[in-house]
Design a protein with these regions (language model features):
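Transmembrane helices and adjacent periplasmic/lumenal helix-loop junctions
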Residues: 113-128
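Primarily membrane-embedded glycan-assembly and transfer machineries that use lipid-linked glycans
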Residues: 1-109, 130-200
Length: 200
């Protein structure tokens, strides 16, 4: 990875470590560059806390990429593997980001609701199009356990997201809603990956 250390996966490792040590994972001063993840992220970090952080992040990102590649090949459209040569993927690699795993959840829908508990800002659109009873039940169980461990974490987390450095594309692109509506009306309910999103 280009970025020193474990990149974005650091939050999973630090949250899991804090919980295992009986510490409050939200006991720090947030900033625009230091906004925590929801508590369920600890589920992903827990298996790796004993490893050096860069190695843990490399394994996580490699496994996420492998799962995405497997999902693409299983779908019977290997040309989609070109995504691994794209700049968004290279950028995600540099910072050990979650986007390959979220993309993989399109092919493995049971993962999608769980990832909403970790990265709601980008996982929600995938989850809403790929809902399964098993996925919702598993995510609900994880959420329940997280609340039993730390009942007030959702409020603590929301309080600390106020420093998040965000942009709202719809305000920077006034014709965004019109363009999106035209695409939907013109091409039907098609996902960014090219699959129909109609309920069956």
């Amino acid at each position: 990875m280009y970025y020193p250390g474990p990149g974005d996966f650091n939050w999973a490792l630090d949250t899991a470590t804090a919980l295992m040590q009986g510490r409050d994972p939200y006991a720090f001063e947030p900033s625009s560059l230091k906004v925590p993840y929801p508590l369920p992220v600890a589920l992903f970090g827990a298996p790796f806390v004993a490893l050096p952080k860069p190695l843990a992040a490399a394994i996580f990102f490699g496994a996420s990429s492998g799962l995405l590649a497997y999902g693409i090949l299983r779908s019977g459209e290997p040309w989609r593997l070109v995504v691994f040569a794209s700049f968004p993927y290279i950028y995600a690699l540099m910072f050990a980001q979650w986007s390959p795993l979220i993309a993989a959840s399109w092919f493995f829908p049971a993962l999608a609701p769980l990832l909403v508990l970790v990265k709601p800002n980008i996982a929600l659109p995938v989850a809403l199009n790929r809902l399964t009873r098993r996925g919702v039940a598993f995510a609900g169980g994880v959420l329940l356990v997280s609340l039993l461990i730390y009942p007030s974490w959702p409020w603590r987390w929301l309080e600390m997201t106020g420093e998040y450095a965000r942009i709202v594309p719809l305000l920077t692109l006034p014709f965004g809603p019109i363009t999106l509506s035209s695409v939907i009306l013109g091409f039907g309910n098609v996902s960014p990956l090219g699959y129909s999103t109609r309920w069956r």
